[in-house]
Amino acid sequence: MHIVICIKQVPDSAQIRVDPVTNTIMRQGVPTIINPYDLFALEERSSCASHGGEVTVLTMGPPMAEDALRKALTVADRAVLLTERHFAGSDTLATSFALSRAIAKIGEAFGTPDIVFTAKQTIDGDTAQVGPGIAKRLDLLQLTYVAKIVSVDINGREITVERRSEGGTQTLMSKLPCLITMLEGTNEIRRGSLDDALRAARSQIVKWNAADAGIEDLTKCGLRGSPTVVKRVFAPPERAEKAEQIDTAEKTPRDLAEELIAGIFLRSGVESELAFDAN
């Protein structure tokens, strides 16, 4: 079994700043992390590990994205970094194109993947479009918003998963190969062992440019291949509302209700004329 996991190095959302002049995210000097939803994909690969095989992690980004791959290598066998200036400024369409070509090349070099994992979305873009875009380009069955891998039948070429939706949880079965987009799952995120960390530090990362990944049409990459235009990025204004705690000591339920209702009307600027019946 061969598993490919797409990850992304993103700015730590707790420390993101917006340039007031360009209205874009200021990435310089902001700590980076592995996209949190990618961690669940890395963890779920253990559900398939009993069948043997290999795990390849893939990311597209600048040379500094190697740091994220080093961390992911603690639970993977190899890492591929897709990096070149032609990829800069890619939107979801251009990103899914480049990653799909890289996955196809990974299949040629290391074996066709049985499962491709992506996060449901990244915390810097929040589009949830790249995973389905890859599946479409590679003609893969796709299982989205998956919370758990239930079972894998490698002989029968089937996988069963739990998918979370607004209506509840669904149990779905799919044929392999397929693409899975992961959201926060039920498994706890575990750290690799010290031996895993040492192995990851010594491992050689495969670095590909566009030509290495089999990309011939550069007009589909980067800004030239990105029809999406972001006009403005901004932080929402701070909300003036604050929580207020009501002291319940030695107060009757009626007193508490009256105080609560009075507070609601006071905040809305409307005078309350409601009164409780003494009975």
Curated annotation (Swiss-Prot):
Any GO BP: nitrogen fixation
Its keywords, alphabetically, are:
Electron transport, Nitrogen fixation, Transport
Q: Which superkingdom?
A: Bacteria
Q: Which PANTHER family match?
A: ELECTRON TRANSFER FLAVOPROTEIN BETA-SUBUNIT (PTHR21294), PROTEIN FIXA (PTHR21294:SF17)
Q: What is the protein's known function?
A: May play a role in a redox process involved in nitrogen fixation.
Summarize the subunit comment. Answer: FixA and FixB form a heterodimer.
Q: What is this protein called?
A: Protein FixA
Organism name: Rhizobium leguminosarum bv. phaseoli
